[in-house]
Amino acid sequence: MAERVRVRVRKKKKSKRRKILKRIMLLFALALLVVVGLGGYKLYKTINAADESYDALSRGNKSNLRNEVVDMKKKPFSILFMGIEDYATKGQKGRSDSLIVVTLDPKNKTMKMLSIPRDTRVQLAGDTTGSKTKINAAYSKGGKDETVETVENFLQIPIDKYVTVDFDGFKDVINEVGGIDVDVPFDFDEKSDVDESKRIYFKKGEMHLNGEEALAYARMRKQDKRGDFGRNDRQKQILNALIDRMSSASNIAKIDKIAEKASENVETNIRITEGLALQQIYSGFTSKKIDTLSITGSDLYLGPNNTYYFEPDATNLEKVRKTLQEHLDYTPDTSTGTSGTEDGTDSSSSSGSTGSTGTTTDGTTNGSSYSNDSSTSSNNSTTNSTTDSSY
C-alpha cells in the first residue's frame, strides 16, 4: 500500500448555522462530486446568501426555460455541479474538468445523476458562428453563466441551481472519514499529486485507500484498457464507498470537523432555506438510491491538429433528455425553438450501446487543441466506438 500523507489541519470557528449547512450538504454534494473524477474538490463553506460562497447567475434565480422560479421543497429541480481546473491556470478561469447534472424530485424522494463527458462536442451558448468545440471550454469562455446555458441547450432541460468547486480538498475529506475501501480491478500505478517523482501502486483485490491514494485511483486512465469507462467504474466505487462512510454513525458525529476540511473555494446559488429543504427531503439517502444515467457515443478527431472530441449518439442522447425531462416534469417549448436548436450534436452521429443506466463521467482524453472546429463532415474525421454494453 502506498505511503500515507500527513494532511494539514485547518481549524476554523463556525457558527451553529453554518455547521447545520455543512451537515446538509456534505452527504449530498460531497459524494456526488467525488465520483466525477475531478481529481478532488472543495465542499461548500456555506449556502447563505450573505456568505461569499453565494453567487447568483446573471439571469437571476429563474432559468430562462422556466416560467417561474422553481420551489425546491415542492417541485422537481436540477443542479449542475462544475469541477473547475483552476489549479492549471493559477487561479484564472480554467475549464470545467467535470460536469454533473443532478435532478431531484422532492415529492418522491428520487435522484438522477448524469455526468457529461468533458470533451463532448457542442455549440457553446455564447457562440454566434455556428462552430462547435468541447463543452468544457464554456467555463473559460463565459464562466458559470455560459456553462449553465450551454448545458441547458445540450440536454434541453432547465438548470435551476449550480455549484462550482475546485480540485483541492478531496484528500482531506477522505482522510477525515478514515479512508475508503475499494476493489481494485487490476494492478496499476499512478503518480502522486504531491510529488510527481512518487508512484502509488495498486494491487488487484481489496484495498483501503487514504486521500492521496484515492485521488490517484480516481484519476488514472492510460493504464486501463477500457479507458474512460474503466476509470468511470473506479470513480463510482469511490462514490459508493464515500457515501457509505459518510453515513456511518462515527462520521456523522464529527461532520463539522469533516466540513472544515472542505470548506473553501466553492460558489453556488443555493440559499440557506433551500439547503435546509434538501436536508429534510434527502436525510438518510444512500448511494443505492441514485439512478445514474450515461451518454454513449464515439470518438471523433477533427482539424489539422487531429483534435479529439466525444460525439454523443443521437438516439441515446434523446433518451437521456426525455428521462431527465420526465423526472423534472418539464416539457420543452418547441414552438419557440428554445430547446434543441443548438443542442451541440449532429443528427447523423452514431455509436454502439444506447443504454441509459450506469455511470459515465468525464471523457478525459485531452486533444492537442481546444479551438473551435465547425466541421461536421465525417470525411474530415476518424471515429472509434467508445461505448460499452455495460453502460
Curated annotation (Swiss-Prot):
May catalyze the final step in cell wall teichoic acid biosynthesis, the transfer of the anionic cell wall polymers (APs) from their lipid-linked precursor to the cell wall peptidoglycan (PG). Residues 329-391 are annotated as: Disordered. GO terms for biological process: cell wall organization. Residues 45-391 are extracellular. Disulfide bonds: none annotated. Disruption phenotype: Single mutant has no effect on cell growth or morphology under normal growth conditions. Triple disruption of tagTUV genes is not viable. GO terms for molecular function: transferase activity. Residues 333-391 have a biased composition (Low complexity). It is an enzyme of class 2 (transferase). This is Polyisoprenyl-teichoic acid--peptidoglycan teichoic acid transferase TagV. The chain crosses the membrane at residues 24-44. It is a single-pass type II membrane protein. Belongs to the LytR/CpsA/Psr (LCP) family. One of its GO terms (cellular component) is plasma membrane. Its EC number is 2.7.8.-. It comes from the Bacteria. Keywords: Cell membrane, Cell wall biogenesis/degradation, Membrane, Signal-anchor, Transferase, Transmembrane, Transmembrane helix. The keyword Kinase does not apply. It is found in: Cell membrane. Pathway: Cell wall biogenesis. Its main location: membrane. Pfam families: LytR_cpsA_psr (PF03816). The keyword Kinase does not apply. Residues 1-23 are cytoplasmic.
